[in-house]
Every structure is written in C-alpha cells, then in structure tokens.
C-alpha cells in the first residue's frame, strides 16, 4: 500500500489523498485508515520511504574498502547507488517532498554528505598522501569538488525525469568521466590547501 502511495505522490505531490490511495489499490477508505489514521500519517510514511527505506550501509563500505583502488571503488559505489534513485518515481517524489518541506531534502543530503561524500574525500586524502579527516577536517573547496561530481551525476535524473530533457543513455560512461575529472583535480586542490602536509606518493588511485 505504501508503494502505491509513493506512486501517487510522484504524480500529484501534496495533492495526494486517502481516497486516492484507496481507489488506487481498490480498497475502501476505512481500510486505508487502518494503516494511516490521518493524511499526515500517510505523508510521513511516504517521506520515510523516499528518504531512507532504500539506504544501503554497504555503499560506504564499498567506498572505504582499500583492497581496491579508489578509481574502481567510486564507479562501483555509483553502480549500486544510482539504481535506487534513478527513476521518475523517486526523483519526482523527492522533488515534491522537498518543495513542501525543505527539511526533507536537508536531512537526506546531510546523510549523503556525512556518510558518502566525506568518505570519498577521506579516501582521496589517503590515496594522494594527505592527512586524514580526523587530523584536518575537509574544507569548503574539497567539499564543493566532491559535491560537483555527485551533483552532476545525480542531476542527470532531474533532467530526464523532472525536466523531461534528453540525457546520455550511457550512465556508466558519464560516471567514469565525472570520476576522472574529480581524481584529476582533487590532488591539485589538496596540494594548494595543504602544501606541506603530503606524506607519500601513491601510484594507484
């Protein structure tokens, strides 16, 4: 029933009603009320489903597994992450939820930042021989650089499913191109930010 509610929300946003859900799943409105006593409860359930039900702790494990070079880990992460969000249902639902309540997007993006993007920065620091984040927190330039890679990749879905404009069908190559640009630029940025902090030279990125 909650999946059907998310489908409706992706189409109508905050225009969703208990009756619309009952009609979609071909049950009576009183039956829906057994699961969602109020419309606010329904919206809360949809929000939880969109925001965190798909979250996989293994994503961070992939990014921090140093038995593989970083240039393999980043594409592997996106190969696992994007299938969970790359659909009209998820993008449009997320968009509607964020417009109705900015804290929705803020909470989700905070988790992306803390668990995923800071992991990439930390692993890039290690790969290029710079201090760990525990010793020196990430600065604005490092943060915006990794957000640039992530945002460009994720924005493909917004262009396709929200704006309905053409995008490359080869998502894997787009991810690789963004990663290469990031790994090419990040050591230069780190050297500018921490010119005397580099400890070693690492060949495999």
Regions found by a protein language model. Name each.
Residues 4, 8-49:
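Helix-turn-helix
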Residues 39, 46, 50, 77, ...:
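Hydrophobic/aromatic residues within well-ordered alpha-helical segments
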Residues 46-77:
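Amphipathic alpha-helical linker/stalk segments
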Residues 78-81, 94-98, 149, 153, ...:
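Short alpha-helical scaffolding segments that buttress acidic/His motifs in well-ordered protein cores
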Residues 80, 84-87, 118-126, 151-159, ...:
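Amphipathic alpha-helical interaction surfaces
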Residues 85-110, 158-162:
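Amphipathic alpha-helical segments used for helix-helix packing
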Residues 93, 103-132, 144-147, 176-180:
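Amphipathic alpha-helical packing segments from all-alpha helical-bundle domains
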Residues 129-180, 189-201:
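Hydrophobic/aromatic-rich alpha-helical bundle segments in the mid-to-C-terminal region
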């Amino acid at each position: 029933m909650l999946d059907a509610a998310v489908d409706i929300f992706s189409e109508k946003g905050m225009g969703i009603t208990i009756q619309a859900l009952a009609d979609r799943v071909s049950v009576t409105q009183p039956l829906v009320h057994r699961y969602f006593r109020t419309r606010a409860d329904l919206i809360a359930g949809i929000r939880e489903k969109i925001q965190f039900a798909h979250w996989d702790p293994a994503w961070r494990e992939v990014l921090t597994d140093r038995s593989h070079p970083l240039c393999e880990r980043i594409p592997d992460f996106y190969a696992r992450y994007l299938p969970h969000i790359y659909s009209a249902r998820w993008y449009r639902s997320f968009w509607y939820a964020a417009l109705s309540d900015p804290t929705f997007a803020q909470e989700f993006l905070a988790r992306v930042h803390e668990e995923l993007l800071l992991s990439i920065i930390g692993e890039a620091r290690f790969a290029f021989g710079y201090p760990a984040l525990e010793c020196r927190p990430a600065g604005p330039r490092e943060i915006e650089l990794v957000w640039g890679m992530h945002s460009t990749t994720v924005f493909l879905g917004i262009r396709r499913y929200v704006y309905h404009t053409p995008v490359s069908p080869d998502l894997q190559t787009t991810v690789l191109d963004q990663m290469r640009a990031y790994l090419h630029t990040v050591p230069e940025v780190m050297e500018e930010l921490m010119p005397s902090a580099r400890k070693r030279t690492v060949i495999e990125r």
